[in-house]
Amino acid sequence: MNSCGLSPESAKSISKKLRLKSPKEPDSSLSFLRDLGLTDTQISKVVRRRPRLLLSDLKKIVLPKLAFLRSIMVSCNDLPEVISRNPDLLVRSLDQHLIPSYNILKSLLLSDEKVVKTLKRLSPIDLCSVQKNFACNLLVLRGLGMPQSAICHLVTSNPKVVCKNVDNFSGNVKEIIGMGFNPVKSAFAFALKVKLQTSPITWKVKIDGFRRWGLSEDEILLAFRKYPSFMSLSEKTIMKNMDFLVNKMGWQPAVVARNPIVFAYSLEKRIVPRCSVIKVLLLKGLIKETISLLSILTTSDKSFLELFVIKHKERVPQLSDVFEMKMGLVDLGFAFNEK
């Protein structure tokens, strides 16, 4: 088993769990996985997750599942990814689990291609929840009038969300609706996904973090309604962005909260380079302080360069270097906290 990428310690531990007389005993199963196209990294992941697969009867247990996966158009290229992500597909009961789960997914998604796409994103735990929770949660969404296309997109992009415990799922749905989201609108699915993927403790930590900037609950909620995905960022990322935009650039926290889309951009790759250029232009009096946060960060690179770098290159030839982070404000004799 050492040859499949496992450390000697892991190989020894798994051998002990399986009561192997020799680490070489499951070589036929390892060779089988390699023949399917799995890399050593993928095989080691499979072995760690489902070590008993190594002792499964290939002919009676594994090959029927493999035949089923191929029958639903899981290509040879897709098999390694599908199996490494979810090795349970090769050991769960075909009649009692895999086929019923497939039928549930197929009834919603209609195409095998979308079912395979969904299977790639399901963990072993999620796969176990398809029959238990999936159908009930779909009924909740359909009962709210959520469009079929939106449900399909949610399932294919984040199937684990719809596999959540039924009570947990329903509670979060009610909470999202209470925040003002309409199930018919696309933002509802994004908000539900973020809320279900964030633990109550983490959610509270993020809300408390915004409150420390002086933002009210209504302001935070408005930001979430405008751009739900910003709450999926880590608290550290959110606080770093707020610190730069408020303390370095001088924007009010409420202004940042009214434009939550700015959290979609990288601090190092977009926000700091662009804001550095803007700060130089402001300090030199070449642009007005009324310039909006959105116009700075959401415009394309080409437009930004034309409006703020090329336009002023004769008066400030160093702007290109500032934009490319080859030169900082200090090199020009400025600081972010200047006004």
PLM features per residue range, with description:
Residues 1-339:
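Long amphipathic alpha-helical repeat/alpha-solenoid cores
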